[in-house]
Swiss-Prot record:
<keyword id="KW-0378">Hydrolase</keyword>
<dbReference type="Pfam" id="PF12705">
    <property type="entry name" value="PDDEXK_1"/>
</dbReference>
<keyword id="KW-0547">Nucleotide-binding</keyword>
<dbReference type="InterPro" id="IPR011335">
    <property type="entry name" value="Restrct_endonuc-II-like"/>
</dbReference>
<feature type="domain" description="UvrD-like helicase ATP-binding">
    <location>
        <begin position="2"/>
        <end position="457"/>
    </location>
</feature>
<dbReference type="GO" id="GO:0000724">
    <property type="term" value="P:double-strand break repair via homologous recombination"/>
</dbReference>
<keyword id="KW-0269">Exonuclease</keyword>
<keyword id="KW-0238">DNA-binding</keyword>
<dbReference type="GO" id="GO:0003690">
    <property type="term" value="F:double-stranded DNA binding"/>
</dbReference>
<comment type="subunit">
    <text>Heterodimer of AddA and AddB/RexB.</text>
</comment>
<dbReference type="GO" id="GO:0043138">
    <property type="term" value="F:3'-5' DNA helicase activity"/>
</dbReference>
<dbReference type="InterPro" id="IPR011604">
    <property type="entry name" value="PDDEXK-like_dom_sf"/>
</dbReference>
<keyword id="KW-0234">DNA repair</keyword>
<keyword id="KW-0347">Helicase</keyword>
<keyword id="KW-0540">Nuclease</keyword>
<dbReference type="Pfam" id="PF13361">
    <property type="entry name" value="UvrD_C"/>
</dbReference>
<dbReference type="InterPro" id="IPR027417">
    <property type="entry name" value="P-loop_NTPase"/>
</dbReference>
């Protein structure tokens, strides 16, 4: 951003305060955060390692570090010679820019003795911890069954199932997981369970009654609004005045109930017992039937609300109290079970030397509760930065409160984008500060609002503001979307003017063109099969296309579900968009829309992404889905995992038949039949498994099938033996080669994707080996656990960010991203409310809410605690869905298209015509139920929808707004007509080709011939690469590539094709050299005082997972120590400014590398300089070598590296504008530095 806004400057420059920055979507929060850090370092002279910067993800931490690094280099490029600045480049590598878990890990490793934990602990992944939890559950429940305690048996009876204890196990795991978001998990659980033991004397203090009263008041207010509307219609000319008495009576009842709700549930219950409704009076014959019917509908709706409230409080509050007292002992025992589970789980992890992410937070919390340790961190860090603060939880908040000073906290985020409640994020932490922190300067706690949007076109911002002004409220969405929350255009003046010119030009082409130019579009698709079947009745045109093909397509439309038909619509929409122009802010001109400009956002991709991919691919649209599922369902994974299962246990029919029928086995269905049928007359009983049938067949027969079976089983036995003695990843890699399956998968359609999926499986096996579980059986169990727990992932990503494809992703994954065109699909899908259907509900404030279950009578009903928590969870889930919708609507830069499907449009119109208020919005089933009622009330743009919906629309309830909407109601016939038109075109082309009646005009023929005969004018440059590494240039220049070697270099034959066999050694010389370079890159030179100090640092590198224990074993510490004892090593240790692993790009003439080349082509040379340091104003350059060279002469040693050092020197002098006075190669094999 060239210019900072006033609010951005405040966020950057404010000091001596705790600052909450409420940064709306697209407001440049990361840029502001980085600039504040830069100013603290450059202007306030604070070292970068004295700032603690906590990000939400590792990727965000990496991006933050890169931005800061780039900003430092930018200052250096300006000619700023500042020792403090150069020091920051050195300190940046060890600065505290990380996730909260990485910070907690550092705290625990530094103070492990305070919590009695092994400092070499490993962080387990989620699947490993799930497997341990299952072990713990089995051990725990077996022990409880042995005890035979009545309390436990009651628990099983209440929360188990008729078949097994799975529901009880799931309950224990869910409660244990939930309480981890509290600083004192088990204490919190005990306290909340004890709250169930209420007495009559403290009944009024319970939080559940208050929660229910608030919800009932919302519903009563809705009934009041409905009755007011009915009263207004009744008083109109022609209105049903005979209904006034009943409506006014209902109004009095509502007022009475509202007052009773303020006095508590017992009073409200008594009042509801007396509730009665007056019958509607007679009306005159000349009454307006339309008004009469509307009033009756409204009255019935208000009665429905009042009856629902009466049902909710259908029992005396004292009966609810009795329920809680009776269920208390059961929940108390459940609490004890969870405490036992937590203790055993912790002990299991301690034995295995692992921790999970929750452990990191709680251990860090325990350590920081020690005042001396907390003071140490408070004194060290000058400022604390928390990115994405809206996604914090109470544990993380408590950790940071321990180490913050009175006025050094900087929190940035947007509560409207808090969409991680399922990860136990607590947006109330942000909301509480947002309400309490003043905007004025001078307070130790203050707030800055960033609401200028630098991403989206103003027309999109207007639409977003219009929707959420009428949707997001404190009552339902947990925040009022008012003027302080609006998104305001932040684009620079030049760009705004350009947009105005484009929009003006579009609008001058007529009203139809003006509608097309609208940047926000909503499409309502009615997928009603009954409507589609009328196509044949209504369609009377004669068509050239055969009727059978048309009927087939109509039949296909009828069979499509909502997702499929929506995908078809979006595919058609993309085909239209690809012909349109779009403004490119970077190019500052109009250009054609490309596929890469478009993204399809879905609420969830698990069951939908595959359908969208299939439909778009069928339409010839290149597409990639960033899905979170489907990986283990792919053909290549299914077969290979079946092979692993078979090797582990041959008596598994499904796995066995799968592998035998595949190219790995090569058997046919006829072979299977032959194996089975040969046994029928000879055996008294059929074999238990197909493997046994194979064994019997081999005993009784001597033919080709027997030979193949013998060979197949022998291979299985060999693999079984190898699986026991080889490392898992090595064994799987060998299976790839032995079966040829990796290359077979690569030859299948989508082979690149399939091979990438197999490589991911190999990587998972490699990671699994680091866990506490070992062996093929455990790995298969690990994979099955991932699948059964719903932790499946999407296919491996094989595309880059610049590939020209339409992307499909979830709204969650799109957070923080932006796209020129966003298509938001699935708006008609129902919200997921499964988490409010559990037998025991949990809430961070309301506590625990169980159902009352009578195990003798096998009956159950809701306790007052569950009723209150269920209601609160529903409202919080709806608030989350609102924020998810907000995130989706704020991703586009130029165009937003929203698509939703409904099957019952008639009933939807009745629902959407209801008043827009919190009550009706709380009953929404989908995003469409929120969007359409609001758009219908747009005075101008909603007219189209109001005309279709019908009814009497009072102009007082319509809203004037500057937002512009393109609203379309699309029937299945429109989709069908488009597809039939395409089929007609195809049929016509086929007819012409068959008749031979089509030929190209002569001018077109000449152009085709001209293009076919065209030759590329720069053929000599075709074999020259665009870029080379320094090592490759050195090889070429030093004669290592002789005649014809350039071709070999450019088209290297893979090892598996050249016949070379894989090395059996685990670490090659090149690997060992990389390890030495890794050590020299990460070792802290300031701590090098003796050989032991290097050993200590190497141990720390293993702990920090920079090195593995296998890699550590090959490091020759004595050789590293000898380097530091040399004169050059001493100069390195004494250097004030020292830089390691410095990457560079250098553009040179291609003829410098390939002298025979006559063209003026250029080459990009890439390299990484191991180390350089300053002595005065000059630079000393050093490159480490681990080659075995003691048998060579000095000239032979230096020959391959002269060009390399020359390029390093040239690049350094260009970048730094300082002279390189000396260049050295240090050979660890010689323990000697050689000057070049």
């Amino acid at each position: 951003m060239a210019h900072w806004t006033i609010e951005q400057e405040e966020a950057i420059n404010a000091r001596n305060s705790n600052l909450l920055v409420a940064a709306a979507a697209g407001s440049g929060k990361t840029t502001v955060l980085v600039e504040r850090i830069i100013q603290l370092v450059l202007r306030d002279r604070i070292d970068i390692d004295r700032l603690l910067i906590v990000t939400f993800t590792q990727a965000a931490a990496g991006e933050m570090r890169e931005r800061i690094n780039a900003a430092f280099f930018k200052e250096l490029e300006k000619g700023r010679e500042d020792g403090h600045l150069r020091r920051q480049l050195y300190l940046l590598n060890r600065s505290s820019i990380s996730t909260i878990h990485a910070f907690c890990s550092d705290v625990v490793r530094q103070h492990f003795h305070l919590v009695n934990i092994d400092p070499h602990f490993r962080i387990a992944d989620s699947t490993e911890t799930e497997l341990i939890k299952m072990e713990v559950l089995e051990e725990l429940l077996d022990g409880e069954y042995e005890k035979g305690n009545d309390g436990f048996l009651d628990l099983v009876e209440a929360f188990g199932s008729n078949k097994d204890d799975k529901p009880l196990e799931a309950l224990i795991l869910r409660l244990h997981s939930f309480i981890q978001s509290h600083p004192q998990p088990l204490s919190w659980l005990e306290e909340k369970i004890d709250n169930l033991a209420l007495g009559e004397d403290n009944w009024a203090e319970n939080p559940w009654a208050s929660e229910l009263s608030q919800q009932i008041k919302i519903e009563l207010s809705a009934a009041q609004d409905i009755l007011n509307q009915a009263l207004k219609l009744s008083n109109k000319a022609g209105g049903p005045r005979g209904y006034l008495e009943a409506i006014e009576s209902d109004q009095k009842w509502v007022e009475l109930l509202l007052k009773a709700a303020d006095q508590g549930l017992p009073v409200l219950y008594s009042c509801l017992q007396q509730l009665s409704f007056t019958r509607l009076g007679r009306v005159s014959r000349d009454v307006d039937e339309n008004l009469k019917n509307q009033v009756k509908i409204l009255r019935d709706e208000s009665k429905k609300i009042l009856n629902a409230i009466n049902s909710l409080l259908g029992r005396d509050p004292l009966e609810y109290l009795q329920d809680l007292n009776e269920i208390y002992s059961l929940m108390k025992y459940l609490g004890e079970i969870i405490q036992s589970f937590a203790e055993i789980y912790q002990e299991k992890k301690r034995e295995k030397g692992i921790v999970d992410f929750n452990d990191l937070e709680h251990l860090a919390l325990q350590i920081l509760s020690n005042e001396a340790v907390a003071r140490e961190y408070r004194d060290y860090y000058s400022y604390l930065f928390i990115d994405e603060y809206q996604d914090s939880n109470l544990v993380q908040e408590t950790i940071l409160n321990y180490i913050k000073k009175e006025d050094n906290l900087f929190m940035v985020g947007d509560v409207k984008q808090s969409i991680y409640r399922f990860r136990l994020a607590d947006p109330s932490l942000f909301l509480e500060k947002q309400k309490s922190y003043p905007l004025q300067d001078g307070s130790v706690n203050r707030r800055v609002d960033l609401n200028k949007n630098f991403r989206s076109h103003p027309e999109i911002l207007n639409a977003v503001n219009y929707i959420f002004r009428h949707l997001m409220s404190e009552e339902l969405g947990e925040i009022d979307y008012d003027e302080k929350s609006y998104l305001y255009p932040g684009l620079n003046t030049g760009q705004e003017l350009k947009y105005q010119e484009i929009d003006k030009a579009s609008s001058q082409e007529g009203k139809e063109k003006e509608n097309t130019a609208k940047r926000v579009e909503i499409c309502i698709l009615e997928n009603n099969p009954d409507l589609i079947t009328k196509l044949e009745e209504n369609e009377t045109e004669e068509r050239e296309i055969p009727g059978e093909a048309e009927n087939d397509f109509i039949e296909r439309i009828i069979e499509m579900d909502n997702t499929e038909i929506e995908a078809l619509l979006i595919a058609q929409k993309i085909r239209q968009l690809i012909q349109e122009d779009i403004y490119d802010p970077e190019l500052q001109c109009m250009r054609k829309i490309e596929y890469r400009d478009m993204v399809i956002l879905l609420r969830a991709t698990r069951n939908s992404a595959g359908i969208f991919m299939e439909q778009l691919s069928a339409e010839g649209i290149p597409v990639y889905a960033d899905a979170s599922s489907g990986y283990f369902d792919t053909l290549e994974l299914n077969l290979f995992i079946n092979l692993l299962r078979l090797i582990d246990n041959k008596r598994q029919d499904i796995a066995l038949l799968s592998v035998m029928r595949s190219p790995i086995g090569g058997f046919s269905i006829d072979d299977f039949i032959k194996i089975r049928t040969k046994l029928i007359p000879r055996r008294e009983k059929q074999p238990y498994s197909f493997y046994e049938a194979m064994e019997f067949y081999m005993e009784d027969n001597n033919d080709d099938l027997k030979d193949r079976l013998v060979f197949f089983i022998q291979r299985l036995k060999e693999w079984e033996l190898e699986s026991r003695i080889m490392a898992l990843d090595e064994f799987m890699g060998k299976l790839f080669m032995d079966t040829g399956y990796y290359y077979y998968a690569g030859a299948m359609p989508g082979g690149g994707q399939r091979q990438a999926n197999l490589r991911i499986l190999l990587h998972r096996a490699r990671e699994f080996q680091k866990s506490s579980f070992k062996g093929l059986f455990s790995f298969i169990k690990y994979i099955e656990k991932i699948k059964s727990s719903g932790s499946d992932m999407g296919n491996a990503c094989i595309i880059g960010e610049n590939d020209n494809v339409v992307r499909i992703m979830s709204i969650h994954k799109s957070k923080g991203l932006e796209f020129p065109v966003v298509i938001l699909g699935g708006l008609g899908k129902n919200f997921n409310i499964r988490d409010s259907n559990e037998n025991v509900l949990l809430h961070r404030k309301l506590g625990i809410g169980p159902r009352y279950i009578n195990t003798q009578l096998r009956t159950y009903h809701d306790t007052i605690a569950r009723l209150a928590i269920k209601n609160r969870i529903k409202l919080e889930n709806l608030a989350e869905e609102m924020r998810i919708l907000y995130v989706a609507c704020t991703r586009p830069q130029e165009k937003l298209i929203m698509v939703g499907t409904t099957r019952q449009l008639e009933s939807a119109w009745r629902r959407w015509s209801q008043p827009v208020n919190s009550y009706n919005q709380s009953r929404a089933r989908s995003f469409l139920d929120w969007l359409i009622p609001i758009i219908m009330r747009h005075k101008k743009e909603g007219q189209y929808l109001r005309e279709i919906a019908g009814g009497d629309w009072d102009r007082e309830i319509l809203w004037e707004d500057e937002s512009r909407w393109k609203v379309k109601l699309i029937s299945p016939w429109q989709l069908t007509a488009e597809e039939i038109r395409k089929k007609e075109e195809k049929y016509e082309w086929e007819r012409l080709l068959e008749q031979g009646g089509y030929s190209c005009p002569s001018a077109e023929s000449e152009e085709i011939i001209k293009r076919l005969n065209w030759k590329y004018p720069y053929q000599e440059a075709e074999n020259i690469p665009a870029k080379l590494s320094v090592s490759q240039v050195s090889q070429i220049s030093s004669g290592y590539l002789e005649d014809g070697a350039a071709d070999t270099f450019l088209t290297r034959v893979p090892a598996f094709l050249s016949g070379e066999k894989d090395k059996k050694t685990r670490l090659s010389p090149a690997d060992k050299g990389s390890i030495v370079h890794l050590v020299m890159q990460n070792i802290d030179y300031r701590r090098v005082s003796r050989e032991d100090s290097i050993n200590q640092q190497l141990g720390e590198m293993v702990e920090r997972e920079i090195l593995t224990s296998e890699q550590l074993a090959v490091v020759e510490v004595n050789k590293i120590w000898r380097f530091f004892q040399t004169k050059l090593g001493q100069r390195v240790l004494q250097a004030k400014w020292l830089f390691r692993e410095a990457p560079f790009n250098l553009l040179i003439a291609a003829s410098e590398v390939f002298p025979a080349l006559e063209s003026q082509e250029e080459l990009l040379i890439q390299g990484i300089i191991d180390l350089y340091f300053y002595e005065g104003e000059d630079i000393v350059l050093l490159d480490f070598k681990s080659d075995i060279v003691h048998h060579k002469s000095e000239e032979e040693i230096l020959a391959p590296y002269r060009v390399q050092l020359k390029l390093y020197k040239r690049a350094l002098e260009n970048i730094t504008d300082h002279r390189v006075k000396e260049s050295y190669l240090y050979f660890f094999d010689l323990n000697r530095a050689i000057r070049v």
